[in-house]
């Protein structure tokens, strides 16, 4: 029963934070929906902020675990193909549960003042972790037989921009972007890099 209650608190809080934002969500609303007293929530989480960051970290750790599960790519594959494959895998992950990305996006677009600095620091940490994993997956990145190690961060940033654009389009239009569209956009985008 304990895990069930904790799960209900977690998923209800996730939904309320996603729908209403951090500031408009309060412990009373969570208690009412879950059917528990505030003391039950405080048994599992120290505060609303603690609960919020538990959800935030859970989502990012799930994403990092997914990224770590992607196999290292052959070093002879061109950078363009490696980055495209990673982009497709990321899109697949986002599509599997778009609400997680909506939660993260909302946190970063509308960060509550009282926790904005913590959100920024956590974001920097998780992006650095993601970039390390991406570099590991890619092995020795090459493009046109030149090592581009010194410029790889620029490539990663540019790829992240395209990924963010595609994610934004999926969230705002509520339509999954198909592989054909991603492929066309990728070809255009990569040539502009």
Predicted regions, residues:
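N-terminal positioning helix adjacent to the helix-turn-helix/winged-helix DNA-binding module
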Residues: 4-5, 9-12
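Helix-turn-helix
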Residues: 8, 16-50, 54
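Conserved amphipathic alpha-helical interaction elements at protein-protein interfaces in regulatory
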Residues: 15, 19, 36, 47, ...
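Alpha-helical DNA-contacting segments of helix-turn-helix folds
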Residues: 53-59, 66
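Hydrophobic alpha-helical connector segments
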Residues: 54, 69-97, 152-159, 182
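Amphipathic alpha-helical packing segments from all-alpha helical-bundle domains
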Residues: 64, 68, 113-143, 153-157, ...
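C-terminal peripheral helix-coil segments that are non-catalytic and often amphipathic
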Residues: 92, 132-139, 157-193
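Amphipathic alpha-helical segments used for helix-helix packing
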Residues: 95-117, 168-172
């Amino acid at each position: 029963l304990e895990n069930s209650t904790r799960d209900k608190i977690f998923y209800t809080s996730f939904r309320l934070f996603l729908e209403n934002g951090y500031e408009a969500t309060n412990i009373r609303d969570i208690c009412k929906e879950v059917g528990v007293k505030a003391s039950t929530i405080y048994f599992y989480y120290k505060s609303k902020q603690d609960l919020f960051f538990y959800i935030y970290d859970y989502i990012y750790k799930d994403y990092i675990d997914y990224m770590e599960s992607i196999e290292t790519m052959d070093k002879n594959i061109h950078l363009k193909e490696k980055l495209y494959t990673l982009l497709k895998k990321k899109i697949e992950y986002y599509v599997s549960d778009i609400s997680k990305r909506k939660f993260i996006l909302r946190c970063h677009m509308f960060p509550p003042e009282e926790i904005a600095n913590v959100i920024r620091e956590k974001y920097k940490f998780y992006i650095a972790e993601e970039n390390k994993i991406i570099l590991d997956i890619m092995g020795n990145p090459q493009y046109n037989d030149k090592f581009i190690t010194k410029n790889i961060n620029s490539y990663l940033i540019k790829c992240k921009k395209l990924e963010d654009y595609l994610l934004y389009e999926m969230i705002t239009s509520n339509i999954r972007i198909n592989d054909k569209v991603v492929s066309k956009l990728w070809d255009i985008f990569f040539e502009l890099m």
